[in-house]
UniProtKB/Swiss-Prot annotation:
InterPro entries: DASH_Dam1 (IPR013962). The lineage of its organism: Eukaryota, Fungi, Dikarya, Ascomycota, Saccharomycotina. Residues 307-332 have a biased composition (Polar residues). It comes from Eremothecium gossypii (strain ATCC 10895 / CBS 109.51 / FGSC 9923 / NRRL Y-1056). Residues 18-34 have a biased composition (Low complexity). Residues 120-150 form a coiled coil. PANTHER family: DASH COMPLEX SUBUNIT DAM1. Component of the DASH complex that connects microtubules with kinetochores and couples microtubule depolymerisation to chromosome movement; it is involved in retrieving kinetochores to the spindle poles before their re-orientation on the spindle in early mitosis and allows microtubule depolymerization to pull chromosomes apart and resist detachment during anaphase. It is found in: Nucleus; Cytoplasm, Cytoskeleton, Spindle; Chromosome, Centromere, Kinetochore. This is DASH complex subunit DAM1. Residues 1-48, 157-179, 205-224, 286-339 are annotated as: Disordered. Keywords: Cell cycle, Cell division, Centromere, Chromosome, Chromosome partition, Coiled coil, Cytoplasm, Cytoskeleton, Kinetochore, Microtubule, Mitosis, Nucleus.
Length: 339
């Protein structure tokens, strides 16, 4: 605020001693007035001494205090005017700051800050978990009610009472006193020469049993002397002998396949071997008797002449000598040599 405005405010403010008094009536008492000459005061003093004394007291004591009060009131009025301006400025600032704070608050409500900690996600997860547990509880209660109403189909196995069992020494093996009966050859064993289910190394038939062996288990007539067949044998038997042979060997598992894939039966055709089986030790006598004695001489002569590849010459000489000496009818009936 400039100095001119302060002067105008001071001039506009006028303090009077009384509202009804005339402004020009007592102005002469505030200071020395130029209207009255200096000699007039002396004449008045002569008239009355009491009035002079009162005028002196007012001029010396009361008028300076009133003048100070007037100046203080003018200063107070100016300060109050300044304070009013400051208050108005603060009101404007308060409105602006409040508007700014309100906008920031609205933005903080509408925007989800990622770094601000909040429990919304955790509370949602807890509510979902409680709902899932409630559904699981209802399902378990329904299952329990269903099992309580329905008859129990589960049989509890009795646990063996091991406390009452006493330790018993193992008994010595019993010596078998049964008479050994020669095994009966079944239909499946008759064609053992061309059967690939046999082992490559076949042991001779054991006529007796050792004393420590357990007694033989009784078997039914259908399962006696029967061996397990591979997939290749099943295909070969089904393709060559027809569905009757498969039903006889495999049981009722191939009835559906035999019914859907009928193959005509060829009774005159013999089963062919998928591989060369082993030769029994007891059957080597036929090979020795059928060979001519001159086979060994041919082998030695061939070795002396060539001197190389004795194994190939030996096999060729043996095969030639055996094929030349043994007739075709006997060669078909016996088993081929082990390779």
């Amino acid at each position: 605020m400039s100095k001119e405005s302060v002067r105008e405010s001071k001039a506009a403010t006028e303090y009077r001693l009384s509202i009804s008094s005339n402004p020009g009536s007592r102005r002469s008492s505030f200071g020395g007035s130029s209207e009255h000459p200096a000699g007039s005061g002396i004449g008045n003093n002569k008239a009355s001494n009491g009035e002079l004394r009162e005028a002196t007291l007012v001029d010396t004591l009361l008028l300076p205090q009133v003048q100070e009060l007037k100046d203080s009131m003018i200063t107070l009025d100016a300060n109050l005017t300044h304070m009013n301006f400051i208050h108005e400025s603060l009101v404007d600032l308060n409105e602006s700051v409040s508007a700014l704070l309100y906008g920031l608050m609205c933005n903080s409500w509408c925007v989800d800050f990622p770094n601000m900690p909040h429990h919304t996600a955790r509370e949602l997860g807890i509510s979902k978990e409680l709902a899932r547990l409630k559904e699981e509880k209802q399902q378990l209660l329904a299952d329990l009610q269903g099992t309580a109403q329905a008859p129990s189909l589960v049989l509890k196995e009795k646990e063996p009472n091991t406390s009452k069992q006493k330790f018993q020494l193992p008994k010595p093996p019993m010596v078998s006193t049964r008479s050994v009966v020669a095994p009966v050859r079944t239909i499946s064993e008759e064609e053992e020469d061309d059967n690939t289910a046999a082992s490559f190394v076949s042991n001779p038939t054991v006529m007796g049993q050792p004393p420590h062996a357990p007694p033989p288990v009784a078997r039914s007539n259908n399962a006696k002397g029967r061996r397990r067949y591979s997939i290749l044998q099943q295909i070969r038997n089904h393709d060559l002998t027809g569905q009757k042979h498969m039903v006889a060997n495999l049981g009722g598992t191939v009835k559906a396949r035999a019914a859907t894939h009928p193959i005509p039966e060829s009774a005159g055709e013999k089963r062919k071997s998928l591989a060369v089986s082993a030769v029994r030790i007891g059957n080597n006598k036929r090979l020795q008797t059928s060979r001519p004695p001159s086979g060994g001489r041919d082998v030695t002569m061939a070795r002396k002449r060539s001197g190389t590849q004795p194994a190939i010459l030996n096999t060729n000489s043996i095969t030639h000598s055996s094929t030349g000496a043994v007739p075709a009818s006997s060669a078909q009936g016996r088993r081929p040599p082990f390779r």
